[in-house]
Design a protein with these regions (language model features):
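Active-site loop-to-helix junction immediately N-terminal to the catalytic Tyr of the SDR YXXXK motif
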Residues: 178-186, 198, 226
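Active-site helix of classical SDR
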Residues: 153, 188
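Canonical Rossmann dinucleotide-binding motif of NAD(H)/NADP(H)-dependent dehydrogenases/reductases
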Residues: 3-37
Length: 289
């Protein structure tokens, strides 16, 4: 029995492929034999990842894609098919996403003292409360994470229906346990998890499996200002996170490789559908006591 992950001959598309986690996803899929379409809003970031894959003997090409504009996704689809000489992809990894400061508060909770100051003055200088959240910022976060998953799925899953395929979404531990300060991101990732299950049921009859990976705490460009100080030291929030993570560290992109390849290779996960897999160093299992 061959127990080696092997994606030889498969074409994988990764959105957000120039980011910290998704660049790792792209490289891992290529190392397992897949041809990879690295897609990102930033063409230079996508090309950097694709070039590194090629330098290491893999097959990859970079494409510009705005996951919030269907016309952009459709244009990328045409370019990908022409570049690789195909009429469909085998694996879609919806990795584009992120947060926005306009959808975040600056405090974990609202204290009675702050509530009294709000009542008296209508605002608190230097403090961003729940009542100061910007609806446009909330919309941006929901659109980027939810619509940024839905639109590429609409465009590429249509061509996968005849022969089946695999879709892997990127959710977050925020979807299981909403974190303080980031209500928009927590809610948006909960939507991605729910949508993953919905898609799994919807596409099961045509042989498209849909699952999601839910990373715990990984240092990325989106959360770096919350977790590290300008000098690189950890913030009090990071200390709190690590004290509630039994493994006592942040995750690295390599920590996601096993789950990614398991979900991508149908030889090992053919009967796995509609699951959201946490990779969090034990964070969700720990009650704090």
């Amino acid at each position: 029995m061959n127990l080696t992950f092997d994606l030889t001959g498969k074409l994988a598309l990764v959105t957000g492929g120039g980011g910290v986690l998704c660049s790792g996803f792209s490289k891992t899929l290529a190392a397992a034999g897949a041809k990879v379409a690295v897609c990102d809003l930033r063409p230079d970031a996508a090309e950097k990842v694709a070039a590194e894959i090629r330098e290491n003997g893999g097959c990859a090409a970079a494409f510009t894609m705005n996951v919030l504009e269907k016309s952009s996704v459709e244009a990328a689809r045409q370019a990908i098919y022409e570049t690789f000489g195909v009429s469909r992809i085998d694996l879609l990894l919806n990795g584009a996403g992120g947060n926005n400061p306009k959808g975040s508060t600056s405090r974990d909770v609202l204290t009675p003292e702050e509530a009294a100051e709000l009542t008296a003055n209508g605002t608190i200088e230097g403090v961003k409360t729940f009542f100061d959240l910007d609806p446009e910022g909330i919309s941006f976060v929901f659109n980027l994470n939810f619509l940024g998953t839905l639109i590429p799925t609409q465009v590429f899953a249509r061509d996968m229906c005849a022969e089946g395929g695999t879709i892997i979404n990127v959710s977050s531990m925020n979807a299981f346990r909403p974190l303080t300060r980031i209500p928009a991101y927590s809610g948006a990732k909960a939507a991605v998890s729910n949508f993953t299950q919905w898609l799994a049921v919807h596409f099961a009859p045509v042989g498209i499996r849909v699952n999601a990976i839910a990373p715990g705490f990984f240092l990325t460009e989106q959360n770096r200002t919350l977790l590290t100080n300008p000098d690189g030291s950890l913030t009090p929030r990071s200390d709190k996170i690590l004290s509630h993570t039994p493994m006592g560290r942040f995750g690295t992109p390599a920590d996601l490789d096993g789950v990614l390849l398991w979900l991508a290779d149908e030889k090992f996960s053919a009967f796995v559908d509609g699951v959201v897999v946490p990779v969090d160093g034990g964070f969700a299992a720990y009650s704090g006591v």
